[in-house]
Structure formats: structure tokens, C-alpha cells
From Swiss-Prot:
It is an enzyme of class 2 (transferase). This is Polyribonucleotide nucleotidyltransferase. It comes from the Bacteria. Belongs to the polyribonucleotide nucleotidyltransferase family. Its main location: cytoplasm. Keywords: Cytoplasm, Magnesium, Metal-binding, Nucleotidyltransferase, RNA-binding, Transferase. GO terms for biological process: mRNA catabolic process; RNA processing. Involved in mRNA degradation. Catalyzes the phosphorolysis of single-stranded polyribonucleotides processively in the 3'- to 5'-direction. Mg(2+) binds at residues 488, 494. It is found in: Cytoplasm.
């Protein structure tokens, strides 16, 4: 009898077969589920502490997605030969899992929860992120931890006008959309997508389609829980101290209402801090014992109630705007003199200084991913230092939030980049957030587009982004355009849309509540389009099109095409030829497998010289053409002459002069520059030259009766000895000079010596 109480559930999901297992692996975790989707295998585990830490005022959820290189049959390439810090993909996938599950934990549940997901086997055609989402949902559901799930998830493609469920890597190459949606049976909670300028109705249809398909996974998880679920925790939310809440409200309500009439963020924040301090001082004066953390939570609830009620009542928002107005926009291009391209984009109290840098092909990022190696020629990096929000903080390694915001901006802009053939540069865009009061990632999209156009990148269209918010109470709701930071914290949805005048290029949605209907999403998309068009108009006013010339400080790229079979000639033995080319011309040369050569130089003359020398190296010798070159070697039967770099031809002794040549050295010396004519080439590429073909035969000179060795007539080979007819021995010939026979003369000469 097995020691395991293993439970397995299998279901068909579109073109894939999905298997979920629990009870065999990681049994000491609160919950553990192994999910297999066509050989992509993911293990998700969840562990929660039984008690919350004292004074804890937030939900400490940690999600770690880890890819094991053995999953793809690889050994890590690092010095220590083991997995190191998380890759960008691992960080993004961790965020992708965190976002839909976080709002499903009950309010007041502050116990530590740690979710760890390992990819232990990978089919390159099946992405592990969807399997990881389903495995996490199943592990939480069977664990008994307080969790209002499960959730389902699906990837949606758009190919030939139809939605495709969970397209593989190959299919996605033909897809106009890559969208991931996650949610419960009743509501969508998270959307992450990029698209090729698709209209709003197509994007909304993809969200609805993916949500419906995700319910298939939810049904299977319910079945797994019925058979293998652990008892649900006997957890009850801490009782609210109604008496303390009333006292806090009496002391702080009026002061906070007054604070939220202040339009300036810093002044408003300072007023709120003073209100918080006054409430605590008032409670102390009344002799009330209180927990400072709990009191601050109560004051935050009062802030949320004030802001939300004002908006739903149709009153002006925090900064005085209505629900559809975009904050004032200021744009300045070329703000940094020696960068390749730059833009300062300011929208209200959110500001991004965005800089673009152009590089060569070797500047592209080479990524050794689990599914295979690839190069990325478009890099987008987002940085937000503490001073952007007027705070004191530590500067350290890149945070998960910065990686996520950078990837969203990159997705938004990628659809409008020129092809590699049109613009062979590697592009790096860096967004430095210098002020932040909401929607800094969308400011990065706008600034990134403008800075690339300032750098001379021929963008297909202007790209703008806008962040939308939502306030919902019962059946009343208000969609907010261009949300502030406070509206993001106090609202129910963060909905970011980026695109062009033609359609959407990126969409990200995080919903904190259930009950967001298709109709609400339609309103949000329509309102976002209106705002996007307004911002695009401002951007087009500031910069109508990309600069015709790239910066004088950027490397100039010149491309040429050669026969792929000639690549080895350009590289040379051990790289000697290309190394000499780059050193002597002061250029950078990259060679593609298809024979495309890219020459990078800030000096056009140097690039032209490199191009000329490459053309010489790769040129084909033409029959009948006259070449000038040095004699590289003297042979007994002729000489070798260099025609082109790396290409010599044979000048036979019979082709040196019209008269008979006894010694080649009498006519030619090594290093001598001569002109020769190409007479023919054979199938092996050997070239035959002629020097005498360039001069006329002197008058009166007759052709030699005896042909030169290379020009003698072809003779049939002699028959084998056993096949020859018997012949009588011939009589010795008389010497031509009438002397002794040759043999006798030779013997006498040897005796004399």
C-alpha cells in the first residue's frame, strides 16, 4: 500500500491536456499542487503562518516564481553552475501571479503567506505562466487558508480574426495579440496584454473570451478540492473597536475633509499628517489607550470614504477636475544636449525625463531563457527614486515594481517600432521618474515615444498611455480619467491603456473588488480612448514626426549584403581579417548569418573605407578583366599574383612573355606590381592569368613549334605493359653530331670526372 494519498484530476482545455496532482510531493506545505500541461510541469506550494505578527497592518504576501534550468535539459551558465538571482521573466511572472490572488484574501488577514512556484519541466511550445497561475490557485484552494478563490487564467491570441485559447510559441508569431486574463467564476481580476493596434471591442472581446475559458480550470479545481482539500482555517477577522472608531472619526473627520480640499499634493499630504497627529494627541488627552497602527488604519478608512463619496456625488475630484479631464500637459524635446534623444513629459504632478540611446547589433541583450536563447534589440528601463514622491528612501537594486512598469511601457511601444531592416539599431530607452502623483508608467510611454522620435527612430505612429480608475458602491460607479496616486490607493481599479490613433498596443488591468461587469469595462475603454486621443494631439503638436537625421553623437550604421559563402573570407583565419579591418578603419563591423554586414562609425569616410575593403574581399574575379597586383611568390613554372584581398591567381611561365621564358626570375620579382588579365577559372576557383595577353606579339616573331609544357596537346595514356604488343628491339640511334653513342659518351665523361 502506498504511503501517499495522491489525488489526480485531468481535463481537456482547448488543444491541451491538463493534469493536476496533490498529495505526493511537498506534503508538509499548507498546500501543494503539481500541474502538467503537455509536458510543461509546474509545482506550486503555499505556506501560511498560523498567527499574524504583532502590530502588523498590511497583508504580507510573497510570491516567488522560479525556473529550474534542468526543466529544459540545461546546466546554468554561471560560474557557480546553479540558479542565481531571479531573471526579469521570473520577476514578471511572480507579479503576474501576485496581482489576481492578493485581493481574494479576506480583509484583516495579516498572516504571512508565502507562495513558491517551480517550473520543473518545460515544453517550449507551452508557456509556464498559465500553468503557474492555475497551480497557485489550486494550491491555495486545497490548503484551507482563508482565500476567496479559486481563480482561473488563460492566454488569448488573435489570429486571422479569431480568438485562440493558449496559443503556443509558434502560433504567437502570427498573433496580433498576447493577452493573459485571470479571475474568479464571477469577475475578471487581472489583465495583461500587448497588441498590434487593435480596436477596443476586439480587446474587450478577448478579455471576455479568456474569462469564460478560465472557468474550465476553476471547475477542475473545485473537483480537486472536494477530494483532497484540507479543513478550512477557523479564522475570524478581528472585531472592530466601534467605540474607538467613533472617537477617531469625531476628532479627524473635519480635519481630513478640509485637507482634501487642498489641490496641491505636498500641501495636502502635510495637512493629512497634521490631522493624523492631532487625532493621536486628542486621544491621548482623553486618556484613551490605543494602538497607533490601528488608529492610522481607521483614519485611512475615513479618507477613502470622503474621497469616494465626493466623486460618486458628482463633486470635483481631489485636484478639482471632473471625471473625464486629463491634467495639464507640458512637453519639451531635446532637453539633454549630448544624448541621442530625450524628452521631458509632464502631466500635472507626474513627470518623466526619458532618454533614448542608439547602439549597434552587438549592444542587443542576449537572453538565455529556459525556452531558448534570443536577442532583444529594444530595451526599456524604468527608474523611480524616492525623491519623486518627496520621500526619504534607500537606493538599491531594481525593484519588482520598476521591472513591471518598464515591461508595460516596452509592450506599449514595441508595436510601433520600425523593423530591423528599416532601422538596424539597438534601442535603449530609460525613463527617469522625477515626479510621481499617479500614472508614471503611462508618462513613460508618452516620453519614450517622443525621445525615440527625437533620436531619429522612425516610429510607425505616436503612442500615448493613460491610467483609468474606478469608484464603485453598490450599483453606482464612476470611471476616472488620469488618476492621481491617492485615487489609485483609494479606488477599486487601476486600468492602464496605451495605443495610437488606430488602436490599442497595451492594456493592463488590476481590479480590487468583484462585480466589475463588461459594461463597466466598455465605459472605461471608451473614456480611455477619448483621453488617449487628447494626449496624442498634444504629442503631435510638440513633435509631428521623427527627426530625419540621427544625433551626431550616435553611431551611424551602414548596411551591405554579401554572399553568405564569403563570410569566412571577411572574418579570416581566427578572425584576423575582420580584426584588421576594424582596427585599421576605426569602425565596428557585425556580420549576420544571411550575409548582411552592418558597419558602425561616427565618421562616414571611415565607414566608406571599410565598405570598400569588404567589397574587395568579397568581390568575384571576372574573366577577361585586367587586375593590378603584387607578385606574391615566384615558382619554377610561373608566379602567383594577388588580384584581390585573399585571392591569388597563377601566371604560368608560358603566359609571361611572347618569347620563350627559361627562368621566371629573369622577368619577375616578388613584390613587383604588374597588370594581368584573367583568362579562365576552373570549378575549384583556381584562376589562370596572362601577362603577354596585354601586349602585342612583336613583328616577325613566329610561334614556337614546340608548345610550352602547359600548352602541349593532350596525349592518351600508354597502355599497361601486359597489354602491349611484342616489338623487336630497335637498333641504337646514331648521335646527331656523328660522334659516339650517347651512352658511351656519358661513360667516358664520368671516367674523366
Amino acid at each position: 500500500m502506498s504511503i501517499f494519498n495522491k489525488v489526480t484530476k485531468t481535463f481537456q482545455w482547448g488543444q491541451h491536456t491538463v493534469t493536476m496532482e496533490t498529495g505526493e510531493i511537498a506534503r508538509q506545505a499548507s498546500g501543494a499542487v503539481l500541474v502538467n500541461i503537455d509536458d510543461t510541469v509546474v509545482l506550486a506550494t503555499v505556506v501560511a503562518s498560523k498567527q499574524a505578527k504583532s502590530g502588523q497592518d498590511f497583508f504580507p504576501l510573497t510570491v516567488d516564481y522560479i525556473e529550474k534550468t534542468y526543466a529544459a535539459g540545461k546546466i546554468p551558465g554561471s560560474f557557480f553552475k546553479r540558479e542565481a538571482k531571479p531573471s526579469e521573466l521570473e520577476t514578471l511572472t511572480s507579479r503576474l501571479i501576485d496581482r489576481p490572488i492578493r485581493p481574494l484574501f479576506p480583509e484583516g488577514f495579516y498572516n504571512d503567506v508565502h507562495v513558491v512556484i517551480h517550473t520543473v519541466s518545460l515544453n517550449p511550445e507551452v508557456d509556464a505562466d498559465i500553468a503557474a497561475l492555475i497551480a497557485t490557485s489550486a494550491a491555495l484552494s486545497v490548503s484551507g487558508i482563508p482565500f476567496n478563490g479559486p481563480i482561473g487564467a488563460a492566454r488569448v491570441g488573435f489570429i486571422n480574426g479569431e480568438y485562440v485559447l493558449n496559443p503556443g510559441q509558434t502560433q504567437r508569431k502570427d498573433s496580433q495579440m498576447d493577452l493573459v486574463v485571470a479571475g474568479t467564476e464571477a469577475a475578471v481580476l487581472m489583465v495583461e496584454s500587448e497588441a498590434q493596434q487593435l480596436p477596443e471591442d476586439v480587446m474587450l472581446g478577448a478579455v471576455v473570451f479568456g474569462h469564460e475559458q478560465g472557468r474550465i480550470a476553476i471547475d477542475a479545481i473545485h473537483e480537486l478540492v472536494r477530494e483532497a482539500g484540507k479543513p478550512v482555517w477557523d479564522w475570524v477577522a478581528p472585531a472592530k473597536d466601534e467605540e474607538l472608531i467613533a472617537k477617531v472619526a469625531a476628532l479627524g473627520d473635519e480635519a481630513l475633509r478640509t485637507a482634501y480640499q487642498i489641490r496641491n499634493k505636498q500641501s495636502r499630504t502635510q495637512a493629512c499628517r497634521e490631522a493624523y497627529a492631532a487625532v493621536k494627541a486628542g486621544l491621548t488627552a482623553q486618556g484613551v489607550e490605543f494602538d497607533g497602527v490601528k488608529v492610522e488604519g481607521m483614519l485611512f478608512d475615513i479618507e477613502a470614504r470622503i474621497v469616494r463619496s465626493q466623486i460618486l456625488a458628482g463633486e470635483p475630484r481631489i485636484d478639482g477636475r471632473d471625471t473625464r479631464t486629463v491634467r495639464p500637459i507640458e512637453i519639451r524635446n531635446s532637453v539633454l544636449p549630448r544624448t541621442h534623444g530625450s524628452a521631458l513629459f509632464t502631466r500635472g504632478e507626474t513627470q518623466a525625463l526619458v532618454v533614448s540611446t542608439l547602439g549597434t547589433e552587438r549592444d542587443a541583450q542576449r537572453i538565455d531563457a529556459l525556452a531558448g536563447e534570443f536577442e532583444d534589440r529594444f530595451l526599456f528601463h524604468y527608474n523611480m527614486p524616492p525623491f519623486a514622491t518627496g520621500e526619504v528612501g534607500r537606493m538599491g537594486s531594481t525593484k519588482r515594481r520598476e521591472i513591471g512598469h518598464g515591461r508595460l511601457a516596452k509592450r506599449a511601444l514595441a508595436a510601433c517600432l520600425p523593423s530591423k531592416e528599416e532601422f538596424p539599431y539597438t534601442i535603449r530607452v530609460v525613463s527617469e521618474i522625477t515626479e510621481s502623483n499617479g500614472s508614471s508608467s503611462m508618462a513613460s510611454v508618452c516620453g519614450g515615444c517622443l525621445s525615440m522620435m527625437d533620436a531619429g527612430v522612425p516610429m510607425k505612429a505616436h503612442v500615448a498611455g493613460i491610467a483609468m480608475g474606478l469608484i464603485k458602491e453598490d450599483n453606482r460607479f464612476a470611471v476616472l480619467t488620469d488618476i492621481l496616486g491617492d485615487e489609485d490607493h483609494l479606488g477599486d481599479m487601476d486600468f492602464k491603456v496605451a495605443g495610437t490613433t488606430s488602436g490599442i498596443t497595451a492594456l493592463q488591468m488590476d481590479i480590487k473588488i468583484q462585480g466589475i461587469t463588461k459594461e463597466i469595462m466598455q465605459v472605461a475603454l471608451a473614456q480611455a480612448k477619448e483621453a488617449r486621443m487628447h494626449i496624442l494631439g498634444k504629442m503631435q503638436e510638440a513633435m509631428g514626426e521623427a527627426k530625419a537625421e540621427i544625433s551626431s553623437f550616435a553611431p551611424k550604421l551602414y548596411t551591405m549584403k554579401i554572399n553568405p559563402e564569403k563570410i569566412r573570407d571577411v572574418i579570416g583565419k581566427g578572425g584576423s581579417t575582420i580584426r584588421a579591418l576594424t582596427e585599421e578603419t576605426g569602425t565596428q563591423i557585425d556580420i549576420g548569418e544571411d550575409g548582411t554586414i552592418t558597419i558602425a562609425s561616427s565618421d562616414a569616410a571611415k565607414a566608406d573605407e571599410a565598405k570598400r575593403r569588404i567589397e574587395e574581399i568579397t568581390a568575384e574575379v571576372e574573366i577577361g578583366k585586367i587586375y593590378e597586383g603584387p607578385v606574391t611568390k615566384i615558382l619554377d613554372f610561373g608566379a602567383l599574383v594577388n588580384l584581390l584581398p585573399g585571392k591569388d591567381g597563377l601566371l604560368h611561365i608560358s603566359q609571361i612573355a611572347h618569347e620563350r621564358v627559361e627562368r621566371v626570375a629573369d622577368y619577375l620579382q616578388e613584390g613587383q606590381i604588374i597588370k594581368v588579365k584573367v583568362m579562365e577559372t576552373d570549378e575549384k576557383g583556381r584562376v589562370k592569368l596572362s601577362l603577354k595577353a596585354l601586349t602585342e606579339r612583336p613583328a616577325g616573331m613566329e610561334r614556337s613549334d614546340r608548345p610550352a609544357p602547359a600548352e602541349r596537346e593532350f596525349r592518351q595514356p600508354r597502355e599497361p605493359r601486359q597489354q602491349r604488343e611484342f616489338r623487336e628491339p630497335r637498333e641504337p640511334r646514331e648521335p646527331r653530331d656523328g660522334g659516339r653513342p650517347a651512352a658511351e659518351g656519358e661513360q667516358q665523361q664520368q671516367q674523366q670526372q
